[in-house]
């Protein structure tokens, strides 16, 4: 039997997913069922745009519910670690110096489900995170970028 992949989540990410699931199941699912019933009352369903739209929304909601349930059935919380021996791990906030543009960037290393570049949350599977994982402050690493490799130096790690 194939081993199921564990989804890495922070405690905050777990709470967000649980809240989203409750909203979808308790509120949005009921709302869309009501919309479908109202559209059915309009008569002929073959050319009923409201019905088609409500069914498409229902499909999206059910797909997301299934996706979240799968995540919640196969997750692992990112554990707190000994802060004396600071190394880059999943869950850490890391400030790096990018030598290609001489700028500093701060990222939080998270699991793929929580990654959101707009919030500076990058997946531990991303090229930057892969390059700096398990390194200490002051150490450098080569990131295998899309266009070319580049060097970064770890300035600060907050666990």
Curated annotation (Swiss-Prot):
Name a biological process GO annotation. regulation of DNA-templated transcription elongation
The record's section on InterPro entries has:
GreA/GreB_C_sf, TF_GreA/GreB_CS, Tscrpt_elong_fac_GreA, Tscrpt_elong_fac_GreA/B, Tscrpt_elong_fac_GreA/B_C, Tscrpt_elong_fac_GreA/B_fam, Tscrpt_elong_fac_GreA/B_N, Tscrpt_elong_fac_GreA/B_N_sf
Record's keyword terms, sorted: DNA-binding, Transcription, Transcription regulation
Any one GO MF term held by the record is:
DNA binding
| Coiled-coil region | none
Q: Which Pfam families does the entry mention?
A: GreA_GreB, GreA_GreB_N
Q: Which PROSITE patterns match?
A: GREAB_1
Keyword Transcription appears in the UniProt entry: yes
**Family assignment from sequence similarity:** Belongs to the GreA/GreB family.
What's this protein's function?
Necessary for efficient RNA polymerase transcription elongation past template-encoded arresting sites. The arresting sites in DNA have the property of trapping a certain fraction of elongating RNA polymerases that pass through, resulting in locked ternary complexes. Cleavage of the nascent transcript by cleavage factors such as GreA or GreB allows the resumption of elongation from the new 3'terminus. GreA releases sequences of 2 to 3 nucleotides.
Q: What is this protein called?
A: Transcription elongation factor GreA
Q: Which organism is it from?
A: Mycoplasmoides gallisepticum (strain R(low / passage 15 / clone 2))
